[in-house]
């Protein structure tokens, strides 16, 4: 965010940040990629924002910047230890703007480790 965010914008930023955290918390070997998407998507739906989350939640990163496993509602791919994926839910309001919160994470034997270290608070 550049500039001062009104309360409504701050709520959206908090909602997308929390959705992203919930998606990360699902990550571990053996989980379907679609479950990560569902964790993000269901939280945003509870906040009334489902119609504004119009893309998948993430993807693998390896030899290509965008590759399998694809993290979206239709993915049947199973997450594996040592894969690197992004978790990047976003909400886009026509005529207002959008918010996307993204981390790149390593799938570990017990869950995940964030590889990105950007702060989650707004940049003013």
Regions picked out by a protein language model, each given a short descriptive name:
Residues 1-124:
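Active-site neighborhoods and metal-handling regions in enzymes and metal-associated proteins
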């Amino acid at each position: 965010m550049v500039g001062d965010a009104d309360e409504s914008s701050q709520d959206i930023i908090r909602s997308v940040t929390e959705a992203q955290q919930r998606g990360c918390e699902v990550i571990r070997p053996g989980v379907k990629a679609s479950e990560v998407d569902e964790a993000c998507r269901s939280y945003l739906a509870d906040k009334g924002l489902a119609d504004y989350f119009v893309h998948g939640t993430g993807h693998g990163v390896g030899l290509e910047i965008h590759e399998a496993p694809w993290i979206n509602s239709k993915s049947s791919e199973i997450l594996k230890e040592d894969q690197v994926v992004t978790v990047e839910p976003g909400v886009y309001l026509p005529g207002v703007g959008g918010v996307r919160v993204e981390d790149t994470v390593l799938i570990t034997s017990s869950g995940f480790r964030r590889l990105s270290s950007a702060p989650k608070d707004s940049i003013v």
